[in-house]
């Protein structure tokens, strides 16, 4: 864990806009983000895994490594994830390219990306990719630090999504709220 924190801090100092967090996500937030996942969840895709806090929680819930695919841009995070999670597929590619690399039968997309701080066209490309790879009843899980949903109302409406807002996770720096989105 100390290695994860050291890596996180090093990458934050080198590229704060890409890391876009002041601390790694807590284990409590990771459990909240992965609630409902298990051995029968099917394929799971994670966008922006960083040091792998959510990845660790996904696997702890019983998702098989061969059913988990990660998309991470940072070269050092990718090397760390590949070493730490053998059997998990790790792509050093943007989340928008998931459509070309993953089938359209994914049960859950877990996102650690800072969607609200991204340019609109990037955010929309990521959301489009997520819902193109999700199975019809698949869900997109995203957290936010703020008081509003991590997807703007126009995207929720355009994608025809239902929204499930979870409780605030106070045991995270800063506190975060988990949202689950599905097509209606």
How should each PLM-predicted stretch be described?
Residues 3-37:
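Class I SAM-dependent methyltransferase Rossmann-like catalytic core
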Residues 41-50:
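Conserved class I S-adenosyl-L-methionine
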Residues 51-63:
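Conserved SAM-binding loop of SAM-dependent methyltransferases across substrates and taxa
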Residues 74-76:
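Conserved SAM/SAH-binding beta-strand->alpha-helix loop
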Residues 87-96:
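Conserved SAM-binding strand-loop segment of SAM-dependent methyltransferases
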Residues 99-109:
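A short acidic, Gly/Pro-enriched loop at the edge of an enzyme's catalytic core
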Residues 124-136:
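A short glycine-rich, Lys/Arg-flanked "PGG" loop and its adjoining helix->strand segment in the class I
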Residues 134-145:
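Conserved beta-strand signature within the Rossmann-like core of class I S-adenosyl-L-methionine
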């Amino acid at each position: 864990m100390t290695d994860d924190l050291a890596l996180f801090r090093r990458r934050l100092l080198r590229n704060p806009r890409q890391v876009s967090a002041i601390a790694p996500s807590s284990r409590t937030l990771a459990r909240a983000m992965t609630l409902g996942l298990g051995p029968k969840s099917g394929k799971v895709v994670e966008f922006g895994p960083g040091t792998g806090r959510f990845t660790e929680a996904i696997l702890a819930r019983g998702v098989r490594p061969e059913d988990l695919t990660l998309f991470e841009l940072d070269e050092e995070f990718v090397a760390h994830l590949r070493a730490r999670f053998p059997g998990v597929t790790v792509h050093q590619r943007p989340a928008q390219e998931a459509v070309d690399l993953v089938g359209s039968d994914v049960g859950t997309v877990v996102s650690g990306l800072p969607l609200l701080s991204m340019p609109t066209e990037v955010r929309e490309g990521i959301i489009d990719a997520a819902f193109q790879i999700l199975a019809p009843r698949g869900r997109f899980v995203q957290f936010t630090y703020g008081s509003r949903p991590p997807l703007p109302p126009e995207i929720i409406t355009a994608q025809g999504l239902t929204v499930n807002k979870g409780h605030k996770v106070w045991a995270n720096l800063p506190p975060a709220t988990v949202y689950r989105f599905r097509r209606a």
